[in-house]
């Protein structure tokens, strides 16, 4: 039956604006060009493209921004394994997505967790530092605060 007056109100999330974030991070969004339905998104240089059919567009956005902020897209060609091994790159980017989703209370975090657990490797200390820094940068870049007077009101990630 109908429940009167019991309207679902989603919990307040710290406002994060995608357009603001992309501008602040100097990242351009381009049209998605891959016809393979399994690809959710990709990043090159300072560009991201998100599949219009992506199941979790926010998760995919954070993952691709993670690749850029972690420096993956500037390590010569993206598929080159000299610098950071490809599977570790994916884990780093997925970890960035996890932190961003959890901070903003957005769906998809459980998929990130499953992905990271399936990998089963140890995340090196240096990767962990890069991951926290990248997530923090992405969250700050899109943070919409009522007052932009330069005062810091965000929690620190230790």
Which sequence ranges carry the predicted segments?
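Hydrophobic alpha-helical bundle architecture
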Residues: 49-51, 55, 69, 81-88
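C-terminal helix-coil-helix/basic helical segment that borders enzyme active sites and/or dimer interfaces
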Residues: 70-81, 140-143
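Contiguous, non-catalytic segments that form substrate-binding/exosite surfaces or channel walls
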Residues: 1-55
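Active-site metal-coordination segments of metallo-dependent hydrolases
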Residues: 78-94, 102
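Active-site recognition of the HExxH zinc-binding catalytic motif
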Residues: 59-73, 93
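Intrinsically disordered, low-complexity linkers and terminal tails enriched in Pro/Gly
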Residues: 1-7, 78-82, 158
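Long, well-structured alpha-helical subdomains associated
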Residues: 85, 98-157
């Amino acid at each position: 039956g109908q429940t009167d007056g019991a309207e679902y109100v989603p919990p307040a999330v710290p406002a994060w604006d995608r357009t603001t974030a992309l501008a602040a991070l100097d990242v351009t969004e381009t049209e998605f060009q891959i016809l393979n339905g399994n690809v959710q998104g990709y990043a090159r240089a300072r560009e991201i493209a998100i599949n219009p059919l992506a199941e979790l567009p926010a998760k995919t956005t954070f993952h691709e921004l993670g690749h850029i902020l972690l420096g993956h897209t500037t390590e010569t060609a993206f598929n080159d394994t000299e610098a950071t091994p490809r599977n570790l790159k994916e884990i780093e980017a997925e970890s960035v997505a996890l932190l961003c989703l959890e901070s903003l209370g957005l769906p998809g975090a459980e998929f990130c967790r499953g992905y990271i657990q399936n990998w089963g490797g140890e995340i090196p200390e240096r990767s962990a530092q890069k991951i926290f820094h990248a997530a923090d940068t992405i969250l700050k870049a899109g943070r919409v605060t009522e007052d932009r007077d330069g005062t810091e009101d965000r929690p620190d990630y230790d």
